[in-house]
């Protein structure tokens, strides 16, 4: 955090920035500043304009009007290359690495020869406490480590302005603390950080100033110490909410299709001594009508387990039983047809076709059941139903998924999974990068789905989310189930964290 009030000259000053898409005003005269050695947090609901503003600053998208003052010079527009030259680097919520290249190659990719310093990279790795095997493939990294590689790419370019988009969305509290420690070291060198997040406690911990965007404007801005939580929430909340379905319709949205019904409490998915990449000897039972939480530190094996259940990874041992039948040898498509549906952690690379229409994406898992060339009118009607149920904000069914904000993309992905009529729904970080209002919509929907006797496996790094939502909780530690299922009062953040660290062993993990 900023330690001196003498840093008067801003690193960045955006003035009167306007942007319009398809006749819709996305940014309406934004003013935004960032100083040396400070964290300026940017909050706002989905579609408030945060990502658009940051893309303009990073040179990805041009503004319609307005100026950017950087280093005392004014610019009407930037390109990504020019932004990098000026010391601006955007670390996206979904890190954009080359999975088939090594970590070292990813960090150095695109650098000019004069910037290709192995010693500099080693110094940065040491300063940030990272212990990567630089020769490992980037595709083997979890989300937390991919984010750190992105930050290292920016620092290798001598970036002075770092834009972090939801950097802690998939991190546990311990990993968040380690990230914040590293950010403090960067701030001490004069780097300025724009920190986009929906997590108010984290923002209060790390940010010097807060700006809240709503409907393309800055609705509130000030020093963190001078803004109350009520002020911030009120600024985020839309003045007028779109009229939606009634509470009962929204809460009890019926699943489509002729889905086999199970009585609540009936075992639907059983894992017997499962062993695979990143986990071993995992046994558990998931019952109809319950939300079973799966917690653990990043790297504990939760996502690897989920991908193995869905058939994306090879099973090395044990049995997967769905409705009493072994499905070890079934393909992903066959598991889907039997009602096993997976919502992946990384929505952009694994969940959505970003260039396809919203209607196509929502119905993507059911196209083969109706003939691949789906009926447009039916797809549009399906999309409209989920738009009302989840408050998805978009202009038209034909627009590409990549044009939506991150939170609305997540809602489209959830709709896609629900349209497949799941008996077992595995959701991996379902509220990652989603604002408070949308998060509550998703919570209501998951409860609604469980109330229809679907078995829900909830994987989340947000332990408060696990505590709020789960009926039972298993905790993974170093690839194994670390404890019998937690129930009742034992489902709390403190107990989950203790088990996640191997009971009382709170050893530090490397970056």
From Swiss-Prot:
PROSITE patterns reported for this sequence: ABC_TRANSPORTER_1 (PS00211), ABC_TRANSPORTER_2 (PS50893)
Pfam families for this protein: ABC_tran
Gene3D superfamilies registered for this protein in UniProt: P-loop containing nucleotide triphosphate hydrolases
EC number: 7.6.2.13
InterPro entries, alphabetized: AAA+_ATPase, ABC_carbohydrate_import_ATPase, ABC_transporter-like_ATP-bd, ABC_transporter-like_CS, P-loop_NTPase
Nucleotide-binding among keywords: yes
One GO cellular component term: plasma membrane
Domain (ABC transporter) ranges: 12-240, 240-503
Membrane topology: Peripheral membrane protein
Locations listed in the record: Cell inner membrane
Protein keywords: ATP-binding, Cell inner membrane, Cell membrane, Membrane, Nucleotide-binding, Repeat, Translocase, Transport
Residues reported in the UniProt entry to bind ATP: 44-51
SMART domains associated with the record: AAA
Subunit text: The complex is composed of two ATP-binding proteins (LsrA), two transmembrane proteins (LsrC and LsrD) and a solute-binding protein (LsrB).
Role summary: Part of the ABC transporter complex LsrABCD involved in autoinducer 2 (AI-2) import. Responsible for energy coupling to the transport system.
Stated family: Belongs to the ABC transporter superfamily. AI-2 autoinducer porter (TC 3.A.1.2.8) family.
Descriptive protein name: Autoinducer 2 import ATP-binding protein LsrA
Species whose genome carries this gene: Escherichia coli (strain ATCC 8739 / DSM 1576 / NBRC 3972 / NCIMB 8545 / WDCM 00012 / Crooks)
Gene that specifies this protein: lsrA
């Amino acid at each position: 955090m900023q330690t001196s009030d003498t840093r008067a000259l801003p690193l960045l000053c955006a003035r009167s920035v306007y942007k319009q898409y398809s006749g819709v005003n996305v940014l309406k005269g934004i003013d935004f500043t960032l100083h040396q050695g400070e964290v300026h947090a940017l909050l706002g609901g989905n579609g408030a304009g945060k990502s658009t503003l940051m893309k303009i600053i990073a040179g990805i998208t041009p503004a319609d009007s307005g100026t950017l003052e950087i280093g005392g010079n004014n610019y009407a527009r930037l390109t990504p290359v020019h932004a990098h030259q000026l010391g601006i680097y955007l670390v996206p919520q979904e890190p954009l690495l080359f999975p088939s290249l090594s970590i070292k190659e990813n960090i150095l990719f695109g650098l000019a020869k004069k910037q290709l310093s192995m010693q500099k990279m080693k110094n940065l790795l040491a300063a940030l406490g990272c212990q990567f095997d630089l020769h490992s493939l980037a595709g083997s990294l979890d989300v937390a480590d991919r984010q750190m590689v992105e930050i290292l790419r920016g620092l290798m370019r001598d970036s002075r302005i770092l834009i972090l988009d939801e950097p802690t969305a998939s991190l546990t509290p311990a990993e968040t603390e380690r990230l914040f420690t590293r950010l403090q070291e960067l701030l001490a060198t004069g780097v300025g950080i724009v920190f986009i997040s929906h997590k108010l406690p984290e923002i209060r911990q790390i940010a010097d100033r807060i700006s809240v965007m709503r409907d393309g404007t800055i609705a509130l801005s000030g020093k963190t110490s001078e803004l109350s939580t009520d002020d911030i929430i009120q600024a985020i909340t839309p003045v007028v909410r779109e009229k939606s379905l009634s509470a009962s319709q929204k809460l009890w949205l019926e699943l489509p299709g002729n889905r086999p019904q199970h009585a609540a409490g009936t075992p639907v998915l059983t894992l017997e001594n499962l062993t695979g990449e990143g986990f071993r000897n995992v046994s558990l039972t998931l019952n109809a009508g319950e939300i079973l939480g799966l917690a653990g530190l990043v790297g504990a094996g939760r996502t690897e387990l989920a991908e193995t259940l869905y058939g994306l990874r090879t099973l090395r041992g044990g049995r997967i039983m769905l409705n009493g039948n072994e499905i070890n040898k079934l393909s992903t498509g066959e598991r889907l047809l039997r009602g096993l549906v997976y919502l992946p952690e990384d929505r952009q690379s694994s969940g959505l076709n970003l260039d396809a229409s919203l209607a196509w994406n929502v119905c993507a898992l059911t196209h083969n059941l109706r003939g691949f060339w789906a009926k447009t009118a039916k797809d549009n009607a399906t999309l409209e139903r989920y738009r009302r149920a989840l408050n998805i904000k978009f202009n038209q069914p034909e627009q590409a998924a990549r044009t939506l904000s991150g939170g609305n993309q997540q809602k489209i992905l959830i709709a896609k999974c629900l349209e497949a009529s799941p008996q077992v729904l595995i959701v991996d970080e379902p509220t990652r990068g989603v604002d408070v209002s949308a998060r509550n919509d998703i919570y209501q929907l998951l409860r609604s789905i469980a109330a229809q006797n679907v078995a829900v496996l909830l994987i989340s790094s947000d332990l408060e989310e696990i505590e709020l939502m789960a009926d039972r909780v298993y905790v993974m530690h170093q690839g194994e189930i670390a404890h019998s299922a937690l129930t009742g009062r034992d489902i709390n953040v403190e107990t989950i964290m203790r088990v996640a660290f191997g009971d009382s062993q709170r050893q530090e993990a490397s970056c």
